Amino acid sequence: MTKISKIIDELNNQQADAAWITTPLNVYYFTGYRSEPHERLFALLIKKDGKQVLFCPKMEVEEVKASPFTGEIVGYLDTENPFSLYPQTINKLLIESEHLTVARQKQLISGFNVNSFGDVDLTIKQLRNIKSEDEISKIRKAAELADKCIEIGVSYLKEGVTEREVVNHIEQTIKQYGVNEMSFDTMVLFGDHAASPHGTPGDRRLKSNEYVLFDLGVIYEHYCSDMTRTIKFGEPSKEAQEIYNIVLEAETSAIQAIKPGIPLKDIDHIARNIISEKGYGEYFPHRLGHGLGLQEHEYQDVSSTNSNLLEAGMVITIEPGIYVPGVAGVRIEDDILVTNEGYEVLTHYEK
């Protein structure tokens, strides 16, 4: 069943007339056309009969025509009201309630004479949750490039270098491999600075005998990777190395349990129980992982409360961590494809 067919099914389920897609990445997902509209209206209208109408600034119309999108295009000038160019009466409209602003909702009520609204958020998340072969190939390439980023960063480590200098070196050097954008702000943290799970790289200088935490990802043809490695520089303290070994055991055990039909919470429990049994449970303050695709964090989450089942075609991260202030912060993260038989690890840099 096609993506549009799934939306039409949901329209029928909710007795709605059309769906209004406004998140730029979701518009891309359905149309193959990517835009960053800023404050301008950029939206896809999907009607119950399957008709698709893309609203975009007039200056982008020719680019849309060159894209895979084959539906109707409503291009508007900055001085025009887009809704006046496509007058409609839509009794019930499904919207992305997690994205649409109140101001834009008021425009829809006025412009399309909308009587009531429903949500289409979950349907879109469920669609994006299962990746096509084309999507998987792009994520696999993004993961390969993330491995290269770690390699670049590790080779640049030397006493006295700052966290920020390593970040800059990675992001500049990876451009030689065709990368134009990182998935998120690259994180490189030295020693016990990594005990802050979302620390900001700064002017701290690398010293011998401490760990270096790398958390990074790249975007390849719109799809993200997201990986973490914690690398020894010299010989860290005995406790720091013990923490590393516990995190590695937790990650390895969780990954090995991945296969279709397993509740996501069970995967979280495996890693969390190992860390807790070793006495570090209070130092593992976040979920085990999350979905990965057009965004670095997307549906679903690998958490202790998520009873949904793993399905073939999902791509998730597994990233246990232990963060002890004044001692060390260790996180190890891999990107995992759920296959019919079990799993495939997409990130490969040594651990």
From Swiss-Prot:
GO terms for molecular function: hydrolase activity; metal ion binding. Keywords: Hydrolase, Manganese, Metal-binding. It is an enzyme of class 3 (hydrolase). InterPro entries: Creatin/AminoP/Spt16_N, Creatinase/aminopeptidase-like, Creatinase_N, Pept_M24, Peptidase_M24B, Peptidase_M24B_aminopep-P_CS. The keyword Heme does not apply. Mn(2+) 1 binds at D226, H290, E319, E333. It holds the Pfam family Creatinase_N. The keyword Cell division does not apply. Its cofactor is Mn(2+). Mn(2+) 2 binds at D215, D226, E333. Its EC number is 3.4.-.-. Binds 2 manganese ions per subunit. Belongs to the peptidase M24B family. This is Uncharacterized peptidase SAS1635. It comes from Staphylococcus aureus (strain MSSA476). The lineage of its organism: Bacteria, Bacillati, Bacillota, Bacilli, Bacillales.
